Structures are given as C-alpha cells and as structure tokens.
Amino acid sequence: MKRIALLAILAFTSLIAYSKYVIVNVEIPGTLDYEVAKQADWKTVDSLKVIGGINGTDVRTYRRMGRGREPAIVDGSGKHHYYIYNEIAGTYVGNTTEGKLKYLDLSEANIVAGGDAYATAVYDDDEKIVSVGRHTKDCYTEDNVVGSLMLSGEFSEVIFPNSATRIDAWPIGSIAWKSLKKVKVPDSVRVLPEMLLWRFENLESIELPSVLEGIGSQAFSYTKVGFGFKMNIEKFPESLRYIGAGAFYEGSYRIFDDYLKDISNLVYIGNNALQSVDSRSWTSLRMPSVVYLGSHKPDEYGRRQFYNPWEIADLTFSREACKSITDTRILEEIAKKPFFIGQGFFTPVLRSMKVRIDNPEMYGDTICVESKAFKDFSELNLEIPEGQWIRS
C-alpha cells in the first residue's frame, strides 16, 4: 500500500514538473526559441508571456508550442487540390507537435516585419481566407499587425499585443475551436477582423476595445459560449459604425442581443449580419435615423464597406440583414426615412406586414428595391409615394 501511495506521489510530482509558466524577454527578434530554451524544454511549457519584438520566426515557435500545424492536402486527385486546416489536434490528417502551450500572453510583445513564414493560409478562388480552399499562401509578419493565423494553436486563453493597430482575418484559426475560452483584444485596435471568433464553441470571456468602429464579416458567426459568459462592456460602443456580413450569423444564440440594443450610429449592416439576433428582446431598440443606399453598393461579403466604411452615405440594410426581425414596429421605425430594401429583406416577415406596407405614409422620398426583395410575394400590390423607386 505504501509503495502504491509513493508511486502516486511521484506521478503527481512528475506532472507538476512538466507544467511551466515562462516569461521571456526577446531582445533580438527571431530568438524566442533560444530564450525559451534557457528556462525550459519547449514541450513542457503550458503558459507563456512574451515581452519585446517578435517576427515570423518567433510566431512559428509559439505556434509549435501550442500544437499549431501546417495545412494538409486532403484531395489531390485530378487537377483540383483542396487544402484544409485541422480542427483539433490529432483528429484529422496532418502532423501535430508535442507542445502543451495553453496560455499565450502577447500584451507586451511588439510584432515586427521579418523572419520566416509562420503559417500557410488557405484561400478560395475569390482570395478570401477559408478553412478549405483551392490554394495557399505563406504568411509573414508586418509591423504592429496581428496577421491571419498568427494565434493559431490549441490555446485556451489568448491576449493580443497592446501595440497592435490592425488584426487581419481569421487570426486564431480553427485549431482552438473547442479549447479557447478567453480572448483579450487591446484598445489600440478599432476594427474586429473577419472570422475573429468564427465557430468557437466554449468561450467564457471576451475583452473588447472600449472604442470600436467596425465588426468584420463572420466575426462572431456560429460562436457559442460557455456558462457564465461575460464581456467587459455592457453594450457595443457608440463609436461602432458598421457590422459586416454574417457577423452574428447563427450559433450565437441571442447571447449578443443585449449588446446590440443601440445601433443608431451604424452606417452599414451587411448581409445576414443580425440573422441570429432575436428582435423580440429589442423592446427599447434605437434604430438609425437614416437608412439609405450610398454611392457604392457592397459586394456579397460587404468587403467594400469593411475596408472603406465611409464611402457609403448613410446606412444600407443588405439582403436578409434583418431576416429574423418579426416585430413590425421595428420595421416601421426603419421605414420612416429613405432606405434601401435588399434582396430577401422582408423574408419571412412580409405577410404579417401586408396592411402596413401598403401604406405609402411609411416611406420616405427615396426607395431602392432589389429585384428579389419581395420574392414569393408577387401578389402584393405596393403603393409607392412620390419619389424615386429603383428596381435593380
């Protein structure tokens, strides 16, 4: 019995020895691996705080410590090659590392250009970063930019650099879909990137900038949160001007409803941006005072507005942007000013609005209607007030 107890103690002691928190000051970019090796075997480090300048070589180092991977070809038949990023370590094709890093703190790190490629991103034919695509490109660091897949690893908590001024699309990748619980984005960043937390399943805490101008496409798409989820803000700030396509599409399960009660300062809402937001909770919602199609119509992903949000005059509701809205009072408020009706905008709420929508007093002077805006409702006879009605 004593022997069994002794072995148990030794085993427990061994586990402690393999769990290490390391603080590293990188004085010369590209030497993170050397600095870590001074303190511990990289395979045993589960918590890492990096101080100083880091380049692509250093990013590659901590990604290896966090079980990051390169993409693997899953179908090389014929002329078509498909690439895919593995979801969770060891569950799909591709090699994994022996790293154990879970906690990554880059708050005092400065990203600088140079060093090796730290990842290979997968793109579709439209040059949009995806999880499965036709071709790949190597990723290199830029000064003060958190690049795509730069934080890709099986991490549970990630703190972005305080010095970062921009975050590119899909910075955390897909490896941490199940493991990531906490994320902190610094105040120095004004725009949340595309696919920031796309498909993450167990989030417990998100810290966002106090001043925020934009939320990129699919930033919180299919996002699920754990019990006791919290954010550091009570609502999205008044500085928020645009929400990209599908930003809250599916999966968020009304978690973000309370944070979207006041969207009166927005200038752009992309396709399906609010698809999963439950409008029934918007009892005191402040809608924008002007809803109008500006000089540049957004593409399918709203990318024109994502990069140049001020090109649009006031506010556009693209197709299906408010698909989930069932409260006609909200639509009446929207319709008090000139507006653009996007494809599928009223689906599936139009039937309940038939009486009200026939009333021309609801509308402003200018109405732009896409050809499929009233799809499946061809029997509806609309009376349009004086002004311009454009059917595109």
Outline where the language-model segments fall.
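Positively charged n-region of N-terminal signal peptides that target proteins for export
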Residues: 1-4
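Structural signature of tandem-repeat unit edges
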Residues: 21-27, 46-54, 79-82, 86, ...
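Beta-solenoid repeat scaffold
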Residues: 64-106
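Hydrophobic h-region of N-terminal signal peptides that target proteins for export
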Residues: 10-17
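Boundary/junction segments of secreted and surface-exposed precursor proteins
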Residues: 18-36
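N-terminal extracellular ligand-recognition/capping segment immediately after the signal peptide
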Residues: 52-64
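Leucine-rich repeat
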Residues: 35-41, 62-66, 88-97, 147-151, ...
